[in-house]
Swiss-Prot record:
It catalyses: 6-carboxyhexanoyl-[ACP] + L-alanine + H(+) = (8S)-8-amino-7-oxononanoate + holo-[ACP] + CO2. Belongs to the class-II pyridoxal-phosphate-dependent aminotransferase family. BioF subfamily. Keywords: Biotin biosynthesis, Pyridoxal phosphate, Transferase. The keyword Nucleotide-binding does not apply. Substrate binds at residues 26, 137, 357. Its cofactor is pyridoxal 5'-phosphate. Gene3D superfamilies: Aspartate Aminotransferase, domain 1, Type I PLP-dependent aspartate aminotransferase-like (Major domain). This is 8-amino-7-oxononanoate synthase. Catalyzes the decarboxylative condensation of pimeloyl-[acyl-carrier protein] and L-alanine to produce 8-amino-7-oxononanoate (AON), [acyl-carrier protein], and carbon dioxide. Homodimer. Pyridoxal 5'-phosphate binds at residues 112-113, 187, 215, 241. InterPro entries: Aminotrans_II_pyridoxalP_BS, Aminotransferase_I/II_large, AON_synthase_class-II, AONS_Archaea/Proteobacteria, AONS_Proteobacteria, PyrdxlP-dep_Trfase, PyrdxlP-dep_Trfase_major, PyrdxlP-dep_Trfase_small. The keyword Transferase applies.
């Protein structure tokens, strides 16, 4: 075997062994799903790790819309959007999103990851400055690091730190308009970005604001319009993803006309990717309608969150949030896995989230509630958490 092959094999083996020793080794679980439960190796477990916040992933109206879309448009789009992959269902969804969220345009992508990276790889150049919250999603951080622009980071939700960076950028690069990037809801902590204050700072320092609202759109704001609506601000660029509250997959970049056209001309993630199936876009249109009409889903999420905190013992360090994401910080990765497995043994699926997804020594259980859960489900979760945590 050539030396280069042995070197790669050694590197891979060493990295895997190190990750396992650190309690950070990740494995996929092959699951099937029905309602709010998952089935693993023949066992039914109540699922508290899904991002299907509004319970739309298995809603009959969404399933019917996708089946209708298959009949109308076939299985796949057949090409990238600039060839023959842009269909009437895609156009209808883009127009619907733009009207609902108050933007000139919506541009569809296959994932939130690709939408974020398309924006940050395409719009900034080497003369620009990106300013990001330190807890932003990996897709944003990776794109910032690989972007030709200069990237600066500020401590999580720290307005003073953001203001200092904006002042420094304005002083050092007076002709540059910085791009400030944050999430609306932070996926691992469930907390909200102080968008009203951030937007004010952006206005004062002539900066653009980009908000990734993957976990806020559909859940927060009037008719589910998201974190920006809740805060009363309009981001220059808004990222909406469809793998959470929409119950499907994909994403859209919300922006003005010129920005949309710029991305169409220059964003490689857009130009060189096959479009999402038009049947999927048809189903997403149905999801968008339900999100706007079904206020009861958001009201139920609020009530279930309150019920959980009513029933969990005060000694348990469950973080109260205004979102369906309820983190329980454990700290040690091995212990987080142990607690997760103990819950699994009692019929609850609650995933342990460990570094590098979260900072070192902040491993946690990421508990998520959905509108598909019942009050009985929440009481069972609380009772089991009380038992398991007290036993640890």
């Amino acid at each position: 075997m050539p030396l280069s092959n042995r070197r790669f094999n050694h590197k891979i083996k060493h990295a895997l062994e190190a990750r396992e020793t650190q309690g950070l080794y990740r494995q996929r679980a092959c699951l099937s799903r029905a309602d709010q439960s998952v089935y693993h190796q023949g066992t039914s477990l109540l699922n508290f790790s899904s991002n299907d916040y509004l319970g739309l992933a298995q809603d009959p109206a969404i399933l019917s819309a996708w089946q209708e879309g298959l009949t109308l448009f076939g299985a796949g789009s057949g090409a990238s959007p600039l060839v023959t992959g842009f269909h009437s269902a895609h156009k209808a969804l883009e127009d619907q999103l733009a009207d609902w969220l108050g933007y000139d345009r919506a541009l569809l992508f296959n994932s939130g990851f690709s939408a974020n990276q398309a924006v940050l790889f395409t719009i900034p150049d080497k003369h620009d400055v990106l300013i990001q919250d330190k807890l932003n999603h990996a897709s944003l951080m990776e794109a910032g690091l690989l972007s030709p622009a200069t990237m600066r980071r500020f401590a999580h939700n720290d307005l003073s730190a953001l203001t200092r960076l904006l002042h420094q950028t304005n002083d050092k690069f007076p002709s540059i308009n910085p791009l400030v990037i944050t999430e609306g809801v932070f996926s691992m902590d469930g907390d909200l970005s102080p968008l009203a204050n951030i937007s004010e700072q952006c206005s004062q320092h002539d900066a653009w604001l980009m908000v990734d609202d993957a976990h806020g759109c559909g859940v927060l704001g009037d008719k589910g319009r998201g974190s920006c609506d809740l805060a009363g601000v309009k981001a220059d660029i808004l990222i909406v993803t469809f793998g959470k509250a929409f119950g499907l997959s994909g994403a859209a970049v919300m922006c003005n006309n010129d920005t949309a056209e710029y991305l169409i001309q220059f964003a490689r993630h857009f130009i060189y990717s096959t479009s999402m199936p038009p049947s999927q876009a048809h189903a997403l249109s149905a999801a968008c309608r339900l999100i706007q009409s079904d206020d009861w889903r958001r009201e139920k999420l609020h009530d279930l969150g309150y019920l959980l905190f009513e029933n969990v013992e005060s000694s348990i360090q469950l973080v109260d949030t205004h979102t369906p994401i309820k983190p329980l910080i454990i700290g040690d990765s091995h212990k987080a896995l142990s607690v997760s497995n103990a819950l699994k043994a009692k019929g609850l699926w609650v995933s342990a989230i460990r570094p590098p997804t979260v900072p070192v020594n902040s491993a946690r259980l990421r508990i998520t509630l959905t509108a598909a859960h019942t009050e009985q489900d929440i009481k069972r979760l609380a009772t089991t958490l009380n038992e398991v945590i007290n036993d640890e």
